């Protein structure tokens, strides 16, 4: 399970005759249910089903950042809580030893079950209420990843890379941006059965399009470098871990969300 709070601020002139700030605060939570089954020596099938909850709170402010009331509300934002499944992943994965290293790879597809919304920018231009939050891509997207790990005395080390590629558009004309992820982490015993984990994560999201066109807002591309720290330990027949990821560097095009930290809690067996 993971969660974060994000903030987005932008100026609009659509609700009132004068420009006002939209101060949007979102709390995003996701629980991912993962199951694996072995089908041959070193080969297995993995299914990942995410369930998301997004809580949105909006405040309107004048240019001096004093709260104001918009009598007729906004077609863009509202106080609401959305929930539902994201796009599940179905993957084949394999692993093998190579000297002191363990190498692994997985490949599969994301299944378009997450809710998608009509073009919010087109609806906004027509003065109609709309929704920007997408729970899925609406397309079957290939997913592939590789990892390698080994131990150096008391220290474990692992590197990981993953890509989700989007080649088509969904029924609303939406094509999500490709996503790339890489990480490197080391772990070491710190107390009893507890192990400390520290690493770096790099995430890249390409530009989304609607009807083949890039809009002036939305996901226009961003790159995030994050530091991660956490602890893990065996628990019964499984393992428990807690991780915090803090953004170090963000490079984004256009007005995009900011977040202070991502917290993740997991249990596996």
Segments predicted by a language model, with ranges:
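Membrane-spanning beta-strand positions in outer-membrane beta-barrel proteins
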Residues: 38, 44, 89, 102-104, ...
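Transmembrane beta-barrel architecture of outer-membrane proteins
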Residues: 23-31, 85-89, 139-143, 177-181, ...
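Outer membrane beta-barrel transmembrane domains
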Residues: 7-13, 169-269
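Residues on the lipid-exposed face of transmembrane beta-strands in outer-membrane beta-barrel proteins
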Residues: 31-39, 47, 90-94, 107-109, ...
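Surface-exposed strand-loop-strand hairpins of Gram-negative outer-membrane beta-barrel proteins
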Residues: 1-30, 62-64
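Outer-membrane beta-barrel channels and translocator barrels
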Residues: 40-42, 52, 97-101, 152-155, ...
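Outer-membrane beta-barrel pore domains and translocons
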Residues: 1-4, 50-52, 95, 108-112, ...
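Outer-membrane pore/translocation modules
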Residues: 54-176, 219
